[in-house]
Amino acid sequence: MKFSLILVPQVLEGMPEPYEHITEQICFAEELGFDTVWLTEHHFSPYGRPSVPAIAGHALANTSRIRISTAVVVLPFQHPLRVAEDWATLDHLGRGRVDVGVGRGNQPKEFAGFNLILHEAEQRFSEALDIIRRAWTEESFSYDGEFWQFPELSVLPKPYTKPHPPIWQAAISDYTVKKIIGLAQDDKGSRKD
């Protein structure tokens, strides 16, 4: 059996930012034998924090065993090439101790804040995840999607973990759960991420 801790820091008016406390909690979780800590990404809100890669890097530098994971990287809000670079770099810094949780997002306020259209989230997510996987596993590639286009390029570094860190997909709706199951069945059960 494995034990994980999900951190959803909340900052109420007048409270200091929780970064020191987050690091203390992660270090304590490692001392207690927890296997993984999950960091939450939220924007324009008093809960979760926006800069998960920075928090993850700090956590990796202050621990030696516990896995550091995301719950989740909201892919429509990020450039997928940057996500691939950031998490491959963190995978090297942690010597394979990262998992990458991804999601499409569901909070209208966050989409409005980034000037994005919520009903485009699924397609933006799908394109971004495809780009990230290809960036991690192909020597070079180009992309011509609805939302992302770029000429042939090589994305570096490639991950420390081969072929890439474990990828976890968040799902709230029945539709998303069925879609994830369908992807796994289409892959004849060989998908390990």
PLM regions: where:
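Internal, glycine-rich beta/alpha segment that forms the wall or movable "lid"
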Residues: 79-186
